[in-house]
Amino acid sequence: MKLYIGQEIEDKEDVYIDASSARSILACGKRGTGKSYTLGNVVEEIHTETDDIVPLVIDPMGIYWTMAEENDDQRDLLWDWGVTEQGFPVNLLVPGDPADRYGDDIVREFRSRGIDLNPLLLNPSDMTPDGWCELFDLNINKPMGITLYRAIRELNEDDTPFYLPDIINKVEMDGSSSDRTKEALLNRLEMARDWDIFADEYQDVWKTFDENRINVLDVSVLDPGQYGLRNLVVDVLGKELFRQRQDARRREEMGLRVEIPKVWLFIDEAHNFVPSGSSSLAKDMLIRWVKEGRQPGLSIVVASQQPSAIDSEVLSQCDITLCHKITTKEDIRSLDKLSQDYMGSNLKTYVRQIDNVGEAVFVDDDEETVQMVKIRPRKSQHGGGEA
């Protein structure tokens, strides 16, 4: 399976990504050079060229719903490339109630444009005791952390799904904690109820996705931050997808029927989720996805205008790099560490050859190739332009 991404700048030969197996891809470039555009390009190809893969876009800017619209703005350019403008079916996932997040007018407009709009809610029982403590920034060796950890651990022992009211009840019934500790912890749990991201009944993640659409998770409606709700949603969702694909892979190896497809996870502004030099709620999960995801059929594409701000463990595991224009010393230095002997020169030497928006250095470690590429125009509307 090959994904058409553009042409070599000099000889105009078509350039493809070999997607016959799981891949880990870095798309980077300073603002306005095309990294989000390129990410959308790969999403289009995955949707068009595969029938056993679910594309899931983590969208921190609220711009990828525009993939449902045709790229009328570049119709002439598309014609020159022999490509036809096209809108794609989009399943827009919203943490919480879409009407509360967007307003009724926006919801109606989305649906009038053919966009399928669905809430995504988290199962509280999918989070570990440590995860709950991290969410509230609680030390598990101090009273509130001890109380919450104990409550989640005891609920897990029943081996059945549990919800926020169950956690609240467990804390209220804790005879080992002081009233002051319980009151402070209950205030935090009531605050979590107001976030409107936790389910009141069990949610099967896969029933939220649509295998026939591009799945876009709009986390722009949530507060940012390394320990904010965006990271929480990505962490819980990613862990569940990883677990289910591991189970599916075991069945595949035994020749048994599998209902859980492979996943390509696309993350824009990835430095907010796997930051260099600091932690986040989603960081450990995403590093595991990059390191161990190939075997269960999990691919990832991380995009950032600040590659130096992405954890080095993620960068070093990427087997494809699509680098647009980069100028800051920190970013160039970070990318240059990815240089390999087969390149014949340091990566920064190739980056300096980029002259125009939409051009990129394409490095494929599996093929041991380096190419200067002009990224093909998008078939669908790009939502990343400035107002």
Where are these regions (language model features)?
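Pre-Walker A (Motif I) flank of P-loop NTPase domains
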Residues: 20-25, 211-215
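N-terminal pre-Walker A segment at the start of P-loop NTPase domains
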Residues: 1-14
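Conserved ATP-driven motor cores of ASCE-family P-loop NTPases powering translocation/secretion/packaging/pilus
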Residues: 44, 289-370
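P-loop NTPase motor domains
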Residues: 41-57, 61-288, 295, 352-368
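Hydrophobic positions on the alpha1 helix immediately C-terminal to the Walker A/P-loop
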Residues: 38
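Conserved P-loop NTPase motor module
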Residues: 25, 356-387
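Conserved lysine of the Walker
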Residues: 35
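Walker A (P-loop) phosphate-binding loop of P-loop NTPases
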Residues: 32
